[in-house]
Amino acid sequence: MTQVVIGQNEAIESALRRFKRQVAKAGIYADIKKNQFFETPEEKRKRKAIARRRQRSRRR
């Protein structure tokens, strides 16, 4: 869980910016986007196979 403690003289905008940075760093956006729709086991296999191929081509 990402939390931001706001300082006494801190502006809300800067606290919000800090919160957004922490959420992005934790990978929460990517996780939400990934789990937005149900993915069948076949789709998972295909996605992982494509990722493997992409990794192999990057190594060369």
UniProtKB/Swiss-Prot annotation:
Lineage top rank: taxon: Bacteria
Source organism per UniProt: Gloeothece citriformis (strain PCC 7424)
Taxonomic path: Bacteria, Bacillati, Cyanobacteriota, Cyanophyceae, Oscillatoriophycideae
Protein name as it appears in the record: Small ribosomal subunit protein bS21
Key words, A-Z: Ribonucleoprotein, Ribosomal protein
UniProt family annotation: Belongs to the bacterial ribosomal protein bS21 family.
InterPro entries: Ribosomal_bS21, Ribosomal_bS21_CS, Ribosomal_bS21_sf
Pfam families in the cross-refs: Ribosomal_S21
GO biological process annotation, one example: translation
Biased composition (Basic residues): 45-60
A GO molecular function held by the record: structural constituent of ribosome
Chain spans, region Disordered: 41-60
